[in-house]
C-alpha cells in the first residue's frame, strides 16, 4: 500500500477554517452589506434608482472609457512585456520597475500628475490643443487615467508566459518558411492569449472601480465626464446609503460577470493549448 505524504501545512480543517474566515472578513461580509442596504429599497425603487438619467450616463462613461482603456492596455501591455523579455537595452531594469509605479503611487498623486500633464497648459495637453484635441476634463482624459492604472496588470500577466515560452516551435515555423506575422498569430499569440485575457480582465475591474486618479482629470461634468464611483460618493455624502449601494451593486454584478466570463475563456484556451476539446 502506497504511503501518502503528509501535507506541509498541518491540519486541513484548521487551514480551511482560517481561509474561510479571512475570505469572509475581507470579501463576503462587505459584499453582503451591499445586499442588506439595497434590500431596504423596494424593487420599483431599485429600478428607479439605477435608471436615473445621471446614473445611466455615469454607467455609459465608466464602461466605455474602461473598455477603451482595456483594449489599449491589451495592445500596449503585450508590446511592453515583449520588449522587456526579448530585448536587452540600457535602462531596462528601470523601465521594468516603473511598470509597477501605478501600484505604489497614491491615486490622488497620479490624478494630479496626469491632470497637470494633459491640461491645456501641460506638456502633452498643449501639444494636442494645437490640433484642437482636448484631453483633460474629457472622456479622453478619463481613458488616459484608466490606462495608467490598468497597464501593469497586462504586463505582469504576459511577462511570465513570454519568459517560459518554448521558442522551438517558432524557430521550426521559421525554418519551414513561415512569415514573421504568421509565426506570431499562429504560434506565439495562442500561447499569450490566456495571459492577455487574464491581465485585461483584472485591468477592466480596476478601471471600473478607479476613483482617485480619475476624479481629478475627469472634470466631473454630470451626464458627460462623471464616473459611477463619483455618483456613488455623492450619494454617500447625502447619506443616501440605499441608493449608493444599489448603484454599487450593479457595478459589482457587471464586474463579476465580466471576470467570470474572462475566467471561462481562459479555461477554454488552456484546454485548447493542452490539446483537449474546445
State where each predicted segment sits.
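Periplasmic/extracellular loop-to-transmembrane helix junction in inner-membrane transport proteins
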Residues: 4-9, 13, 36-71, 86-89, ...
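Hydrophobic alpha-helical transmembrane segments of multipass integral membrane proteins
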Residues: 25, 60, 64-76, 80, ...
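C-terminal transmembrane helix and the adjacent membrane-cytosol boundary/short C-terminal tail
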Residues: 7-10, 14-18, 26-29, 33, ...
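Transmembrane alpha-helices and adjacent helix-loop boundaries
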Residues: 104-111
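Interhelical loop and adjacent transmembrane-helix boundary motif
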Residues: 7-12, 46, 53, 211-265
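Transmembrane-helix boundary motif in ABC transporter permease subunits
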Residues: 2-8, 67-99, 112, 116, ...
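Transmembrane alpha-helices
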Residues: 17-22, 101, 148-150, 154-166, ...
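Membrane-interfacial helix termini and adjacent extracytoplasmic/periplasmic loops
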Residues: 2-7, 43-51, 56, 91-92, ...
Amino acid at each position: 500500500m502506497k504511503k501518502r505524504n503528509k501535507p506541509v501545512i498541518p491540519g486541513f480543517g484548521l487551514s480551511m477554517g482560517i481561509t474561510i474566515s479571512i475570505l469572509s472578513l475581507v470579501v463576503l461580509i462587505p459584499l453582503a452589506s451591499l445586499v442588506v442596504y439595497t434590500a431596504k429599497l423596494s424593487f420599483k425603487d431599485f429600478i428607479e434608482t439605477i435608471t436615473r438619467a445621471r446614473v445611466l450616463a455615469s454607467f455609459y462613461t465608466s464602461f466605455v472609457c474602461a473598455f477603451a482603456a482595456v483594449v489599449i492596455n491589451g495592445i500596449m501591455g503585450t508590446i511592453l512585456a515583449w520588449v522587456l523579455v526579448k530585448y536587452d537595452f540600457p535602462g531596462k531594469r528601470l523601465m521594468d520597475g516603473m511598470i509597477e509605479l501605478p501600484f505604489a503611487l497614491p491615486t490622488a498623486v497620479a490624478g494630479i500628475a496626469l491632470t497637470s500633464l494633459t491640461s491645456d497648459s501641460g506638456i502633452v495637453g498643449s501639444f494636442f490643443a494645437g490640433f484642437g484635441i482636448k484631453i483633460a476634463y474629457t472622456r479622453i482624459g478619463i481613458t488616459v487615467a484608466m490606462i495608467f492604472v490598468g497597464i501593469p496588470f497586462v504586463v505582469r500577466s504576459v511577462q511570465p508566459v513570454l519568459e517560459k515560452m518554448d521558442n522551438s516551435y517558432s524557430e521550426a515555423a521559421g525554418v519551414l518558411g513561415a512569415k514573421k506575422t504568421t509565426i506570431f498569430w499562429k504560434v506565439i499569440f495562442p500561447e499569450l492569449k490566456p495571459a492577455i485575457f487574464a491581465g485585461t480582465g483584472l485591468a477592466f475591474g480596476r478601471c471600473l472601480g478607479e476613483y482617485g486618479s480619475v476624479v481629478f482629470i475627469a472634470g466631473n461634468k454630470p451626464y458627460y465626464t462623471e464616473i459611477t464611483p463619483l455618483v456613488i460618493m455623492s450619494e454617500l455624502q447625502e447619506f443616501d446609503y440605499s441608493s449608493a449601494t444599489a448603484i454599487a451593486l450593479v457595478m459589482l454584478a457587471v464586474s463579476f460577470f465580466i471576470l467570470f466570463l474572462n475566467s471561462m475563456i481562459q479555461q477554454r484556451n488552456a484546454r485548447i493549448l493542452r490539446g483537449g476539446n474546445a
